[in-house]
Amino acid sequence: EDNALHFAKQGPTVFLFVGVNGVGKTTTIGKLAHRYKEEGKKVLLAAGDTFRAGAIEQLAEWGRRVGVDVVKKPEQSDPAAVVYDAVVKAKQENYDILLVDTAGRLQNKVNQIKRVITREIPDAPHEVLLALDATTGQNALTQAKQFKEVTDVTGIVLTKLDGTARGGIVLAIRNELKLPVKLVGLGEQMDDLRDFDPQEFVIGLFKGLVAKDR
């Protein structure tokens, strides 16, 4: 199982984020931007969720906090146009990483956005990451199925896995959908986004089960 994130051999690496609203997608992008900025990479964000009031501003705020550039247009703009501008900018100005936010309810738009990216960078997007809220259990599984039907999801970002993590959902996603979990969000802090380590996770899950039985 491939839990690692894939990067471009040369030129910008593009990660496309999908998922319904309210699962922590934009927050995940902000945290990942922080991680790569700390590693010394040049990071660009694309505000492709142009339909939700506040989504553009939320991403712009993350850009300010982290200190990275954000490509955005006014609300109700065509998301594909935003992403096109971002991809062109990433290529021309030698960005290492481009993280693309998308609207939650427009799964049909995701493929259009992907085509825009691939036209400019043939092997991109290098990851299509589906954000799921770990606390929603079966609902998360249903969402994953819906997104997997319309677009080629390459991995899962599991958010809100802090505290008494309902971790069984990870196993369900892996078993039913054959999708690797690549990142987990463990809290609200900037560095609370971790690479998913299956072994560590299984040990944690087992400990949780043992504790419950006592």
Listing of model-derived features with the role each one plays in the protein:
Residues 22, 50-51, 109, 136:
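Short acidic/polar alpha-helix capping motifs at helix-coil junctions
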Residues 58, 78-93, 107-212:
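Conserved catalytic-core segment of NTP-binding enzymes
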Residues 103-105:
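Short glycine-rich anion-binding loops that position phosphate/pyrophosphate groups of nucleotides
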Residues 1-48, 55-78, 82-91, 97-100:
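Primarily NTPase-proximal linker/entry elements flanking Walker-type ATP/GTP-binding cores
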Residues 25, 49, 101, 133, ...:
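Acidic active-site catalytic centers that drive phospho-/nucleotidyl reactions
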